[in-house]
Structures are given as C-alpha cells and as structure tokens.
C-alpha cells in the first residue's frame, strides 16, 4: 500500500523554531562498514543529566511556546492557521473515540487518526488550557491504550501510535489523571517499545534504508522520552539504538538530496526526520546531527524541482502523481534551517480557514521561524520544466 504524506504534528504550525546546530568541528565521522554516524552520547547518565525536566519538551518547550504566543498576536498567517486548528479540534470532539479496526493487516489508518487528533487537540490545549479539551485528550489516550496491541506486525502502525500517545502525555504536562499517565507510559513500554526488541518480529526498519526507518525510529524516540523517568535504562538504550540506526536512511539523500523513493515518500519519510530533529532539540538541546547530515538540506531543492507547473510531480519509483494543494509544510521547516524563505509559501497557508481545516495534509502544519532564518542571498529557483530540459541537453 502506498503511504500517504505523513499524518504528523500540528505543533509544527506556529512554532518559532530555535535551532541548536551541531558544531561543525564535531564530526562524528564515518564507519568504514556503514554510513556516517550521528553523534551518540546517549546513556542512562546522559539521559538523566541532559533531558529537559519540565514539560512540554517535545518540539514545544517554554521558550518556543513564548515565541509561539508572540506570533499568535502579531502574524496574520499564524492566526489564520490557529483558527483552522480550532475548527479541526471542534470537529474531532464530535467524532466517536477510536477503535482497534484493522484494514487488511494494517492499523495505520487508526494510528494516523490518533496522531491527527492529538496534534489538533494538543495545540489548542497548549494555547487555551481548556478543561474540555484536556478531558477529550484523556478519553482518546485511554481508548487507544486499552487496545490489545498496536499491531506490531506492521510497525509503522506502532510508531505513529507511539508518537501520538507520547505527545499527548508531553503536551498535557502532567495534567491528565494519574491513572491515565500510568496507563499511557505502560502502554508505550509494552505496546510501543518492547515489541521492537523482538528479534523474530518486524524490526528490519531499525537499520533499513527507506521511510520505515525514519518513521519507526522517530516514534521510538518520542516514546522513549515520554517514559524516560519511568524506565531510564530502556529509554536510553532505545534512543541510542535509533541514533545508530537513522543514518542508514539519512545516507540515501546523498550525494545531492535526491530521494530514491520519489517526491511523495520524500514528504512522508522526511517529515518524520524533521519532527525527530525537533523533538531531540527541544528535549536535549541538540538533534545529534540530523539536520546537518550530508545532503539532507539539499533534498529540499529536490522537492521543489519535482513539482511541475500543472501541480503534478515528476515522479518515479512508487511516487504518487499529484501533490497537495494545501502547502508543503516540510519545506517550511527547511526554510527555518537554510534561510531560503521561498521554501515557505505564506500565501498558501493564508487560505480560507475551512479549506485548511479540511485538507488531509493539514495534519502537518508549517514551521514559522522567520526570526531564526539566517540572512543570506536566496537564489531564484528555475522553473522545473526548464531544469529538466537543461538536464537532458
């Protein structure tokens, strides 16, 4: 089944991203038997000393929230997007709670819906601290944590559900009932993390070279941070394993940023890598080299050049045919990291509220980090068609 653009994090909307880039002199080097490594100092001692103690600490933290609130007062695009989030949250509250219903062998649709719901409800809760929203988040978490499992035979399902539950815990910052917090942490351990240590199970993604690596390792990192105080040994071991495993997928961007699975899967896999980068930066003050990994930033231009004037893709492999009209939120993150503001299409995100709230891809919302973009001269992008013609000549 072809994966759709990731149902990720609405917290990407509105966030003033505070990058803490890895020192250029701290080159972790390459393993002659594998890809260039990320920095990996992770241990129980490192986890206990370096992990931010207060919540939220995943993508959002107190510093980022302060900047976010400032944007909500001053930026009309951010204001427009937040209204769309509010509308989505209202619609979610009218829906029934999720049930464990497989489609074929997959639970992925349920996991993605849970991730969407946590993003929308969680962002509204962070801004408004509404008891009604908090109660609905509690109900959503209890419902999915009472599933018999999260379908580990198809680990994407586990990964996206784990990220959803981890964010629900983090963004409610201890305000859920103690029984729910304990249930959620136990579920993250037993249904999320531990099945990934089953050698007979579906664990090839750990050092895989496609989007499964990016999605599943990202989900395990989020889950590990959420349960760090409950089981620091398991958390540190799992984060360390993911930091060792992720380069096997990140190396696929080399040498020029071209993604082997095409533009559609670039959107899915890359969106999880940028979310993972953001989670690590907000929680530890560093992403251990993800954003600076060779050719990773170059891939943003690949994404741009795969877009045709007709709104279709120059596609290959099992890439889809047509891109979303809802804006490219992953490219918006690259705008904050590279200074290339054209990667962030503000006019697209200033669409009608109803349109934004009903786009499936609105589940992942843009990063607004203009204050943090480095000042640099931005090259004009050639038209994709002309580039392709020039390439042939």
Kindly give the residue locations of the regions a language model identified.
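Carbohydrate-active enzyme catalytic cores, enriched for enzymes
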Residues: 204, 227, 268-393
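Short hydrophobic/aromatic segments of transmembrane alpha-helices and their interfaces
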Residues: 6, 47-50, 115-117
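Aromatic-lined, polymer-binding surfaces characteristic
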Residues: 57-73, 78-312, 319-320
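Bacterial N-terminal signal peptides
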Residues: 9-19
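Bacterial N-terminal signal peptides that target proteins for export
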Residues: 1-9
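Extreme N-terminal leader/anchor segments
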Residues: 25-83
